[in-house]
Amino acid sequence: MPLPDLLPIAPFTRPVRGEVTLPGSKSLTNRALLLAALCDHPVVLTGALFSEDTQLMVAALRRLGLTVFANEPARTLAVSDQASAFQAKAPVDLFVGLAGTAARFLTALCAAAPRGVYRIDGVSQMRKRPMRGLIDALRALGAEVRCTEREGFFPLEIHARGLRGGPVEIDASESSQLLSALLMVAPLARAATQITLTSDVRWTFVEMTFRLMAEFGVRIDHAGSSTTFEMKAGRYSAPSRYAIEPDATAASYFQALPLVVGGTLALPGLRPPGDGLQGDSAFVDVLARVRARAAGQLLEENFHEISDTFLTLAAITPLLAGPTRITGIAHTRQQETDRVAGMARELMQLGQRVVETRGELEIHPQPLRLGETIETYGDHRFAMSFAILGCRDVRGDGRPWLSIRDPACCAKTFPNFFELLATLRQKSLAD
């Protein structure tokens, strides 16, 4: 059933119980799709995410000539016919919507292709997201990448002739996806490639890329430096089946839910911190510190490495026992929306005292203002984070006190989020 434009959040009146089957990781699904497309044999991805972002990636790979068979009930994506890719004689148009992973990865893939003309564009918000670091690096490796409207941004037109390899520098300060995209296509170059990072970067996502590439048969030599990476020219080769981990960022909402409403939730298959490929699994450690802090004590958390989860914590700070300072989030001003400014605005609308700087938020809990509507700015993480806050029975009678505008934006990464939340609420009443 389609979600309404304005969704009142029905609070939990009893503690949550049960378990949640999490969707597959978006970051891993789109990386694995790219690497599977670069193998020389069919690859089946199990536990894959089915959402707008991954569907955009799948649609683009099909337009590039690959076969991708999607079985949503089984949560599998089968990639084959790699030899048929990049054969089109006419220009190929690719649409990436607002999917940052698809946008960056496909740009690098098309630049590394042996032939063809590729035009890549997205929605208006995507045209504001940074691409310059990747574009400059691809050009330095011999790619012809044209920015057809504004330099450093979409839309792009790529006249492919492969990459020559050799030394190249990249500034990935605006998004680690820029570096990950370059790393994944570097083995396609005609000669070994030495990539030197010239900026700070979120290492958890880069480490994810390193480890996934290794599982697909390509290892990276750090060349005696933590910021220079060398890759020989070669091909990827993966097992015929590859399992995608459950999404650790999506898990953060359901890890926070028991803190808001009481009870316990099981999240089958979710890897603990340090065990899997996803840095966002460390959010559970943040919640442990939230629970342990003394009443009135300032809690400070640096989210630089796990910034996709900062909204989960920020949204529930009105319920916490003291002020919270969230740092390391300046780069999130250039994601789906300006997440720092948006979060400050919505919390203040709910009556909270918020101090906002370039890369920090400090929230001082105040009595919640009831009957407000949360603007999501088309950003799925705003919708899901504030939905968890709305699950607290603030009125004490089970009546909704908070509404979410455009809840359907969750389709970007977690299409059935609100359905799962409603199921958990009903189950809590039955227990």
Swiss-Prot record:
GO cellular component, one term: cytoplasm
Single GO molecular function: 3-phosphoshikimate 1-carboxyvinyltransferase activity
Pathway: Metabolic intermediate biosynthesis; chorismate biosynthesis; chorismate from D-erythrose 4-phosphate and phosphoenolpyruvate: step 6/7
Active site residues of this protein: D308
Positions bound to 3-phosphoshikimate: K26, S27, R31, S175, S176, Q177, D308, Q335
Domain of life from the UniProt record: Bacteria
InterPro entries (alphabetical): Enolpyruvate_Tfrase_dom (IPR001986), Enolpyruvate_Tfrase_sf (IPR036968), EPSP_synthase (IPR006264), EPSP_synthase_CS (IPR023193), RNA3'P_cycl/enolpyr_Trfase_a/b (IPR013792)
One example of a Gene Ontology biological process annotation: amino acid biosynthetic process
Pfam families: EPSP_synthase (PF00275)
Keyword Magnesium: no
Entry similarity comment: Belongs to the EPSP synthase family.
Function of the protein: Catalyzes the transfer of the enolpyruvyl moiety of phosphoenolpyruvate (PEP) to the 5-hydroxyl of shikimate-3-phosphate (S3P) to produce enolpyruvyl shikimate-3-phosphate and inorganic phosphate.
Subunit structure: Monomer.
Name this polypeptide is given: 3-phosphoshikimate 1-carboxyvinyltransferase
